[in-house]
């Protein structure tokens, strides 16, 4: 019996000041070229919260639009605000930066996040209206400090500033004098990732209707590392986030694998549930402050707004087969092995063609492929092209190569079996995961039967290997009821007959 | 095109043509690969 996808949640955090102060493109520029034109022009290209909310890919991410609806809109999307766009979506929300800074403090167990007294007084009433955070989380927000103490900590004590609307409103304190792993910079990244995972988990409780104490295990699959100098990647951000989210009966662990980590985590979670080890497993990831404004130089140069101004997060709940929700079919798992090689053809063969052939299926038996779902509005002006389209084109090309598709049908294949991308370029966030919620709904609504989720990861960025990586699996309509009917079982009558036969045989042997 | 005495720097793209694939294409030519890496822009 396979495990099933019960619920998904998707959140964004608008983080315009973090783009300027924490995105590595900007922090690097301040080191190598502090007086650059780019840094001078950058603030003029930062979007307001309302602009970020009205951005069609963001509305898609939180579930207010479907990928299909987004695909019908002409590109580029950045100058086509969605009328009636809202903060809340079917799967989550777009949280403003000021509220998020308070959530970061609530997610900090070591008194490292300090906020300005007036800023807290102004922002806390808004957070108190949040329907999903609860009193336990709000109680962790402290009254705040004087502005002069905050400035001193940033200027004299190696603290990392927290900004809102260009103003210094707080800081993250370093947790060790010399250990770079506990520097204010690293802690800010980790706490932002943790807090956005907490928000995603709280939304998952809402979208699933599952009580917090029912979740037994959490797998966190971001790209951050937490630990100290003796165990730099010691980890368990999963349990750290579960604690704040109120999942009192959960333990957990982290899965790492660059952008492929979520897909690895989904397969592991599905396996844990299928094996009966746990009944309810959540997979979650928060966002990356480092990647904010990653391609902003190109966006600014071309007169565009800085489109990488949101942190992403998601959470997915995988549970035992309920006969209704879509199955995660572990009989169709593709994997990029050490011996696969790096060419695009080899990669897609290992992730798509090979697992389908092993299952006796063709490429076109899959209704939708969800590979790298990066928003092309972000990547095209930066010269990285349309990443999802490139992936779907390669899948279609393989279908042509195997003879199941005519060459002339390639564009139609991409349209029918692919989708436009809508996810922010937050590394692990776009890699298949954003489609899980939509796929579940489309399968439940009878619009399709099978989706393949594909995660791909750039292991070479860590300079330990030149290997690429990836893993894929199929989400499919629940076959529970049909399968049980087809599988030959033993009826009560048959059991009775077998016992009677055994007793007769036993009695006969006694007589003998 | 002759690649004799040519020095090559390869910057591959994770979602395009990765470095090792370009290296593979240059095997059998006389080009000298000075540096090869694959970068990720997303």
Enumerate the predicted regions with their spans.
Chain A
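Condensing-enzyme catalytic core mediating Claisen C-C bond formation in acyl metabolism
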Residues: 1-191, 298-363, 416, 455, ...
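Conserved catalytic cysteine-centered active-site region
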Residues: 167-180, 184-188, 227-268, 272-279, ...
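Short, well-ordered amphipathic alpha-helical segments that serve as non-catalytic structural scaffolds
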Residues: 193-209, 238, 344-360, 395, ...
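Conserved beta-ketoacyl condensing-enzyme motif
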Residues: 193-252, 256-257, 362-393
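Structural signature of cysteine-dependent C-C bond-forming condensing enzymes
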Residues: 207-216, 246-251, 275-285, 358-364, ...
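Acidic, glycine-rich active-site loops and adjacent beta-strand->loop/helix elements
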Residues: 221-226, 257-262, 285-291, 455-460
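Short acidic, glycine/serine/threonine-rich loops at helix termini
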Residues: 229-232, 264-267, 292-298, 380-383, ...
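Flexible, glycine-rich active-site loops centered on histidine and acidic residues
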Residues: 275-310
């Amino acid at each position: 019996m396979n495990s099933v996808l019960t619920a998904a949640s998707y959140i964004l955090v608008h983080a315009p000041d973090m783009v300027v102060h924490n995105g590595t493109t900007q922090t690097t520029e301040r080191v190598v070229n502090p007086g650059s034109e780019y840094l001078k022009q950058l603030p003029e290209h930062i979007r307001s919260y309302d602009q970020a909310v009205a951005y069609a890919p963001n509305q898609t991410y939180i579930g207010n639009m479907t990928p299909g609806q987004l695909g019908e809109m002409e590109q580029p999307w950045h100058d086509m605000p969605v009328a009636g766009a809202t903060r809340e979506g079917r799967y989550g929300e777009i949280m403003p930066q000021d509220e998020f800074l308070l959530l970061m403090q609530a997610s900090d167990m070591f008194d490292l996040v300090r906020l300005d007294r007036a800023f807290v007084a102004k922002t806390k009433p808004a957070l108190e209206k949040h329907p999903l955070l609860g009193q336990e989380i709000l109680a962790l927000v402290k009254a705040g400090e004087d502005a002069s103490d905050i400035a001193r900590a940033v200027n004299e004590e190696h603290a990392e500033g927290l900004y809102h609307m260009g103003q210094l409103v707080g800081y993250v304190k370093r947790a060790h004098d010399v250990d770079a792993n506990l520097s204010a910079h690293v802690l800010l990244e980790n706490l932002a990732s943790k807090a956005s995972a907490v928000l995603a988990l709280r939304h998952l409780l809402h979208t699933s209707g599952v009580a917090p104490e029912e979740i037994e295990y959490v797998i966190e699959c971001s790209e951050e590392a937490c630990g100290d100098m003796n165990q730099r990647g010691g980890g368990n951000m999963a349990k750290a986030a579960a604690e704040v989210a109120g999942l009192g009966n959960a333990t957990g662990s982290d899965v790492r694998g660059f952008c492929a980590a979520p897909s690895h985590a989904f397969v592991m979670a599905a396996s844990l549930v299928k094996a009966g080890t746990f009944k309810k497993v959540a997979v979650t990831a928060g966002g990356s402050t480092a990647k904010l404004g990653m391609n902003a130089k190109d966006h600014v140069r071309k007169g565009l707004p800085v489109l990488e101004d949101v942190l992403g997060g998601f959470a997915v709940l995988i549970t035992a087969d309920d006969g209704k929700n879509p199955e995660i079919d572990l009989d169709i798992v593709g994997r990029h092995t050490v011996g696969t090689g790096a060419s695009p053809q080899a990669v897609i063969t290992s992730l798509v063609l090979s697992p389908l052939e092993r299952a006796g299926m063709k490429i076109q038996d899959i209704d939708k492929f969800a590979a790298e779902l990066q928003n092309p509005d972000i990547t095209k002006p930066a010269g990285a092209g349309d990443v999802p389209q490139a992936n779907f084109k390669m899948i279609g090309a393989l279908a042509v190569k195997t003879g199941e598709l005519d060459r002339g049908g390639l564009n139609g294949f991409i349209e029918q079996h692919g989708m436009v991308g809508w996810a922010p370029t937050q590394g692990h966030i776009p890699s298949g995961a954003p489609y899980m919620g939509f796929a579940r709904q489309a399968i439940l609504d009878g619009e399709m039967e099978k989706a393949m989720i594909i995660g791909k990861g750039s292991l070479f960025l860590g300079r330990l290997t030149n290997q690429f990586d990836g893993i894929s699996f199929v989400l499919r309509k629940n076959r529970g009821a049909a399968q049980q009917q087809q599988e030959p079982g033993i009826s009560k009558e048959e059991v009775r007959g077998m016992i009677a036969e055994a007793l007769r045989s036993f009695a006969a042997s006694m007589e003998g | 095109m002759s690649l004799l005495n040519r020095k090559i720097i390869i910057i591959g793209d994770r979602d395009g043509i990765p470095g090792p694939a370009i290296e593979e294409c240059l095997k059998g030519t006389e080009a000298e690969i000075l540096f090869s890496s694959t970068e990720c822009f997303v």
